[in-house]
């Protein structure tokens, strides 16, 4: 690696580790496809302006496209400069970038300079930062990885979150990974998800040489664990949490029912929140109907509806324990035990939540 490349790599690492505020000059349509943590979309051009300039570039070349770009943004450029300057004033350490760190970045920085505001340009722009974070994830797949397994409700995600070297792939995906994994808010875009995981890995690497990750399928809701990282996970040693059924039931009842009721009510208000919560549980159960079989699904659905009615009338979530116990017994536990048997040679330790946490604290650094 050349000295200049190494310096840029160190710069990118520093920008992310210091949580440097970033002005993303790309058009909104570009930003929506994926962005970085700490970035704010303050575009030089609107989507329509960008499209016109792109068409002009293809037909008439760069010079004509630049001229058209100046003409298109002229009427609103003072407003855009004001927004950039305000962001820089509120975030003195801010940098800016466009897609490649080229013309859009230089023009915007010059506009700011003409108004007495200096700002640094990220060399290589979004494309270089994105490539850097992809490399971070790829390199992480070669690190020492430890996978945390266990039946549904064992608190694997809670365990990951409690560890200094835990990489929370479900939390960053905003999905718990199961049929009941959907959250109140939407999942991020795949690119944004990968970017955030990479930044998390950078932070962990400051104090640890290993990563502890939850045993997960490749898909987490509508998102996917990055390919190289997932490949590393399938080879890594494991620990397995074996919490008693009663503890698991109470934990799942809290997560599926108590917590989700609160989240939906907070986001949507009491009436709409309740309707969304009902739909969340109904859709979750419907999502595993084929695995349960028609008859079991009908029985469990009846139990679920009774539990919802009881909760609405009394506020008690106790009735939900019945159908949750059934899906553990008839679906989740048999499925996970089957999967775990195929990974038995990778298991290094088994124990309760607390025992596994203590083992990981001592044996993974």
Swiss-Prot record:
The lineage of its organism: Bacteria, Pseudomonadati, Pseudomonadota, Gammaproteobacteria, Alteromonadales. Residues 16-138 form the Rhodanese domain. It comes from the Bacteria. It catalyses: 5-methylaminomethyl-2-thiouridine(34) in tRNA + selenophosphate + (2E)-geranyl diphosphate + H2O + H(+) = 5-methylaminomethyl-2-selenouridine(34) in tRNA + (2E)-thiogeraniol + phosphate + diphosphate; 5-methylaminomethyl-2-thiouridine(34) in tRNA + (2E)-geranyl diphosphate = 5-methylaminomethyl-S-(2E)-geranyl-thiouridine(34) in tRNA + diphosphate; 5-methylaminomethyl-S-(2E)-geranyl-thiouridine(34) in tRNA + selenophosphate + H(+) = 5-methylaminomethyl-2-(Se-phospho)selenouridine(34) in tRNA + (2E)-thiogeraniol; 5-methylaminomethyl-2-(Se-phospho)selenouridine(34) in tRNA + H2O = 5-methylaminomethyl-2-selenouridine(34) in tRNA + phosphate. Belongs to the SelU family. Pfam families: Rhodanese. Monomer. Keywords: Selenium, Transferase. InterPro entries: Rhodanese-like_dom, Rhodanese-like_dom_sf, SelU. The keyword Transferase applies. GO terms for biological process: tRNA wobble uridine modification. One of its GO terms (molecular function) is transferase activity, transferring alkyl or aryl (other than methyl) groups. The active site is at 98 (s-selanylcysteine intermediate). The gene is selU. Its EC number is 2.9.1.3. Involved in the post-transcriptional modification of the uridine at the wobble position (U34) of tRNA(Lys), tRNA(Glu) and tRNA(Gln). Catalyzes the conversion of 2-thiouridine (S2U-RNA) to 2-selenouridine (Se2U-RNA). Acts in a two-step process involving geranylation of 2-thiouridine (S2U) to S-geranyl-2-thiouridine (geS2U) and subsequent selenation of the latter derivative to 2-selenouridine (Se2U) in the tRNA chain. This is tRNA 2-selenouridine synthase.
């Amino acid at each position: 690696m050349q000295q200049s490349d190494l310096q840029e790599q160190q710069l990118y690492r520093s920008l992310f580790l210091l949580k440097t505020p970033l002005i993303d000059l790309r058009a909104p349509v570009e930003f929506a496809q994926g962005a970085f943590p700490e970035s704010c979309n303050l575009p030089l051009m609107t989507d329509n302006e960008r499209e016109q300039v792109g068409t002009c570039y293809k037909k008439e070349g760069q010079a004509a496209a630049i001229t058209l770009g100046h003409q298109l943004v002229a009427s609103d450029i003072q407003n855009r400069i004001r927004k950039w300057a305000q962001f820089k004033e509120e975030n003195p350490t801010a940098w800016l970038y466009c897609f490649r760190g080229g013309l859009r970045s230089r023009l915007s920085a010059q506009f700011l300079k003409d108004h007495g505001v200096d700002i640094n340009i990220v060399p290589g722009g979004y494309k270089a930062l994105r490539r850097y974070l992809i490399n971070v994830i790829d390199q992480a797949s070669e690190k020492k990885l430890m996978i945390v397994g266990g039946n549904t409700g064992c608190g694997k995600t809670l365990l990951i979150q409690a560890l200094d070297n835990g990489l929370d792939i479900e939390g960053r995906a905003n999905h718990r990974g199961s049929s009941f994994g959907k959250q109140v808010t939407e999942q991020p875009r795949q690119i944004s998800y990968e970017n955030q995981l990479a930044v998390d890995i950078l932070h962990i690497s400051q104090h640890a040489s290993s990563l502890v990750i939850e045993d997960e399928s490749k898909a987490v809701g509508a998102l996917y664990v990055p390919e190289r990282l997932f490949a590393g996970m399938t080879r890594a040693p494991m620990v397995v949490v074996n919490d008693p059924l009663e503890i698991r039931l109470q934990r799942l009842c809290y997560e599926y029912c108590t917590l989700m009721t609160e989240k939906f009510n907070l986001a949507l208000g009491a009436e709409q929140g309740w309707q969304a919560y009902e739909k969340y549980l109904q859709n979750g159960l419907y999502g595993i109907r084929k695995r349960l079989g028609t008859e079991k699904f009908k029985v469990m659905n009846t139990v679920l509806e009774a539990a919802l009615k009881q909760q609405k009338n009394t506020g008690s979530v106790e009735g939900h324990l019945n159908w949750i116990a059934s899906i553990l017994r008839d679906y989740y536990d048999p499925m996970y035990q089957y999967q775990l048997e195929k990974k038995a040679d990778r298991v290094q330790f088994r124990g309760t939540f607390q025992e596994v946490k203590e083992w990981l604290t001592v044996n993974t650094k």
